[in-house]
């Protein structure tokens, strides 16, 4: 066969022995003779199995499959023209002044002078302050104050929960639910059993039925707490069912207000599909401003949002230059969604110091999309094998072996991965490139079985499909290098606790693979890609309907999300919480894109709204 001209020994196998040698690459066969000769083989090569409705002939005469995608939704001139005045020193100075004022408020919460903090409300007020700065996206300024406030609340935590204040005689649903959620998210050992105290003698959650604003807010916080459930917590499942029904009923009765808008938002996005920056923007719009401290909280949130918007402009322009430099606009067969991926990154990493994370995440996510379109749709089998070999060789000289449309892609991957490894070395104090290359080999190898399934029309079993596709989905690629730039040293043995095949990474990969399939399988099938978790599940369970298969897979996802909650918050993890949270938020932001439909094949209304509200449009002051 002509392909014998390329001989590359794989760096690693696909077994778990991947990590047996942390930084030492396996041997590579250095002899790849006459690479330029491979270009002679490009014409007349059989392509991947073609769907009659999505095929096209390229200039090279090869009949190829193409996706029915719309292309760049965001005019480059618009991006270049984004203007902002929020980098002016006056805004930075105002932000600093507001931060100090809010710190003073935190530090004065122990003062009982009738004006500030009553022993009948001090617990709830502390929780409310912590929850407010977190939801407004300004909590990075108050980490010490948050810890002090939560230590205080936890010192009064009881088996039946807490009241509004340390001297409250009766436990309170609002305070207990908000406390359960907030303390759990910060690693305090609190049990969901406290919610049993709010059931009636029949074991059912109950409320007065009057639906006052206070009661509604209590049930809203019960709903928010129920989403931070761990596996086996039946009371949390019951709380979610009860609170969801209650809040939907309340929406039918209460007038349109800040409270109703908040309820609608949270019922729609919950927690696992709720991007932090989008929630911050919503919360600014509905946040109460009855007191001077509430006004200062909102003002700081808005000023910080717009200062960050100035930074987003520069980063997005930098990303667009990178995108153009490697010729991605000329690739007509792939999705042009680099702006969307930058938006995703900036929705979950809002600290201005995390620029490397945001740009690395956007670039790695875009690579995954382009390679998915090449391997699943556009490339011929021979071209795919050549590209796979080139990635393993990791040498820019092999670019001459590749067809024209692959050359820029290969050099972009090569240059960018190397560049990001240098960024990571500044944080990690060691060269992580070899480790990252191993991840890329495993990832790129996983594409080949799927390409062969498409070519042959083979439909694998559900488990066979999942074992391979959770790697080919590319989650590891989008997580690994970004978290290495976060500022937290990750020794190899700790990195293994969050990187594939550790359970944390495995869960994220499976969740996104399954959820993505429930949104994409029909469009994929129309392009000739039959294998999906839906079709494979139906194959394994003869007689089941497509609708039932989707329902079963969604149930799997919901159960896996509870496991992911535990992996994020379990007390014995050695991985820094900032890295766990970043990986978890990557899952959340991709899950957001699949909320109602495939947000990646063609940018949906929801994804476009996310770009506008979190990147393109500043908040009115």
UniProtKB/Swiss-Prot annotation:
Q: Which residues bind Mg(2+) 3?
A: 524
EC number(s) reported in the record: 4.2.3.52
A cellular component term, taken from the record's GO annotations? chloroplast
Which Gene3D superfamilies does UniProt cross-reference here? Farnesyl Diphosphate Synthase, Terpene synthase, N-terminal domain
Database matches in PANTHER family = (E,E)-GERANYLLINALOOL SYNTHASE, ENT-COPALYL DIPHOSPHATE SYNTHASE, CHLOROPLASTIC
What Gene Ontology terms for biological process does this UniProt record contain? diterpenoid biosynthetic process; green leaf volatile biosynthetic process; terpenoid biosynthetic process
Q: Give residues annotated as binding Mg(2+) 2.
A: 372, 376
What is this protein's gene name?
A: TPS-(-)Bphell1
Residues binding Mg(2+) 1, per UniProt: 372, 376
This one is known as (-)-beta-phellandrene synthase 1, chloroplastic
* Highest taxon of source: Eukaryota
| Targeting presequence | 1-49
Q: Where in the cell is it found?
A: Plastid, Chloroplast
Recorded GO MF terms: magnesium ion binding; terpene synthase activity
UniProt entry keywords in alphabetical sequence? Chloroplast, Lyase, Magnesium, Metal-binding, Plastid, Transit peptide
Q: What class of enzyme is it?
A: lyase
Q: Where is this motif: DDXXD motif?
A: 372-376
Q: What is known of its domains?
A: The Asp-Asp-Xaa-Xaa-Asp/Glu (DDXXD/E) motif is important for the catalytic activity, presumably through binding to Mg(2+).
| InterPro entries per UniProt | Isoprenoid_synthase_dom_sf (IPR008949), Terpene_cyclase-like_1_C (IPR034741), Terpene_cyclase_plant_C1 (IPR044814), Terpene_synth_N (IPR001906), Terpene_synth_N_sf (IPR036965), Terpene_synthase-like (IPR050148), Terpene_synthase_metal-bd (IPR005630), Terpenoid_cyclase/PrenylTrfase (IPR008930)
The pathway noted for it is: Terpene metabolism; oleoresin biosynthesis; Secondary metabolite biosynthesis; terpenoid biosynthesis
Co-factor: note: Binds 3 Mg(2+) or Mn(2+) ions per subunit.
Function description: Monoterpene synthase (TPS) involved in the biosynthesis of monoterpene natural products included in conifer oleoresin secretions and volatile emissions; these compounds contribute to biotic and abiotic stress defense against herbivores and pathogens. Catalyzes the conversion of (2E)-geranyl diphosphate (GPP) to (-)-beta-phellandrene and, to a lower extent, to (-)-alpha-phellandrene.
**Required cofactor names:** Mg(2+); Mn(2+)
């Amino acid at each position: 066969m002509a392909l014998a001209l390329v001989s590359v020994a794989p760096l690693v196998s696909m077994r778990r022995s991947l990590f047996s040698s942390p930084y030492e690459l396996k041997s590579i066969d250095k002899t790849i003779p006459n690479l330029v000769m491979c270009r002679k083989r490009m014409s007349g090569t059989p392509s991947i199995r073609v769907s009659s409705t999505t095929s096209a002939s390229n200039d090279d005469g090869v009949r190829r499959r193409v996706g029915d995608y719309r292309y760049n939704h965001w005019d480059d001139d618009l991006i270049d023209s984004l203007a902002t005045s929020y980098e002016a020193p006056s805004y930075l100075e105002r932000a600093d002044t507001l931060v100090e004022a809010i710190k003073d408020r935190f530090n004065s919460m122990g003062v009982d002078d009738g004006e500030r903090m009553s022993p009948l409300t001090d617990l709830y007020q502390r929780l409310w302050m912590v929850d407010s700065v977190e939801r407004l996206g300004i909590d990075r300024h108050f980490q010490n104050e948050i810890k002090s406030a939560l230590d205080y609340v936890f010192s009064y935590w009881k088996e039946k929960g807490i009241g509004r204040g340390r001297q409250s005689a009766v436990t309170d649903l609002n305070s207990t639910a908000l406390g359960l959620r907030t303390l759990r998210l910060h690693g305090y050992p609190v049990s969901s059993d406290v919610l049993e105290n709010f059931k009636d003698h029949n074991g059912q959650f109950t409320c007065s039925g009057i639906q006052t604003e206070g009661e509604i807010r209590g049930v809203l916080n019960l709903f928010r707490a129920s989403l931070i459930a761990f596996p086996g917590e039946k009371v949390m499942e019951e709380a979610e069912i009860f609170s969801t029904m209650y809040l939907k009923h309340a929406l039918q009765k209460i007038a349109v207000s800040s409270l109703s808008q908040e309820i609608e938002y949270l019922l729609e996005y919950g927690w696992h599909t709720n991007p932090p920056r989008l929630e911050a923007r919503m919360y600014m719009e509905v946040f109460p401003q009855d007191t001077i401290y509430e006004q200062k909280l909102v003002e700081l949130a808005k000023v910080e949002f717009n200062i960050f918007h100035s930074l987003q402009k520069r980063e997005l322009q930098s990303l667009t230059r990178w995108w153009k430099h490697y010729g991605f606009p000329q690739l007509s067969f792939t999705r042009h969604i680099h702006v969307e991926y930058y938006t995703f990154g900036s929705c979950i990493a809002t600290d201005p110091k995390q620029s490397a994370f945001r740009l690395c995440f956007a670039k790695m996510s875009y690579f995954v999309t382009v390679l998915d379109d090449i391997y699943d749709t556009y490339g011929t089998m021979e071209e795919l094998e050549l590209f796979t070999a080139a990635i393993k060789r990791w040498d820019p000289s092999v670019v001459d072996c590749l067809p024209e449309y692959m050359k820029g892609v290969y050099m972009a991957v090569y240059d960018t991965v190397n560049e990001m490894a240098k960024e990571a070395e500044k944080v990690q104090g060691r060269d992580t490139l070899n480790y990252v290359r191993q991840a890329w080999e495993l990832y790129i190898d996983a594409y080949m079985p799927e390409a062969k399934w498409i070519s042959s029309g083979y439909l694998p079993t559900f488990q066979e499909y999942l074992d391979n596709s959770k790697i080919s989905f590319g989650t590891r690629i989008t997580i690994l290098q970004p978290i290495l730039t976060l500022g937290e040293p990750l020794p190899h043995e700790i990195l293994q606790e969050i990187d594939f095949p550790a359970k944390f990474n495995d869960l994220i990969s499976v969740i996104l693979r399954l959820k993505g399939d429930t949104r994409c399988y029909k469009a994929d099938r129309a392009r000739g890609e039959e294998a999906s978790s839906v079709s494979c599940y139906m194959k394994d369970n003869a007689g089941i309907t497509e609708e039932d298969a989707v329902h079963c897979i969604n149930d799997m996802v919901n159960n896996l999300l509870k496991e992911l909650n535990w992996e994020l918050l379990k007390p014995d993890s050695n991985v820094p919480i900032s890295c766990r949270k970043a990986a978890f938020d990557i899952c959340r932001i991709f899950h957001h894109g699949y909320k109602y439909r495939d947000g990646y094949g063609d940018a949906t209304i929801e994804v476009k709204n996310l770009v506008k509200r979190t990147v393109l449009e500043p908040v009115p002051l």
